[in-house]
Amino acid sequence: TGAILKEIVNLVGSDRVRINYDTANAIFYGDVDVVQDLGACMDRVGYIHLKDKAGGRKEWDFPALGKGYVPFPELFAMLDKAENHSPFSIEIEFTAAGPKDLAEVNQAVLDSARYLKEHGFVL
């Protein structure tokens, strides 16, 4: 969870060590409300791993951005308010079976890029 990661980073005691926050893993592994969880560690976040989550909490289902239930607009607003300009990466893991083919991967990347552009990001 963000609180645990913040505790670890604080124990290191270096401004060069930051949290790489993974939005969907916080739900899948941490069973937390991602908005509250990110808020708990925002001041120590240095990188954001954007990954959406669909299906049940422990179901391996990570679709294109905007196709799951991670509240990205709320997270983006929190980051803006905190003046946290950490870089992002996008991860799309699909389901446990993986993508059907390269066309599905390409479409998921396009959908994710479109989603970010719709929310004001320049790619």
Predicted regions and their residues:
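Histidine-acidic metal/acid-base catalytic patches
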Residues: 2-21, 27-123
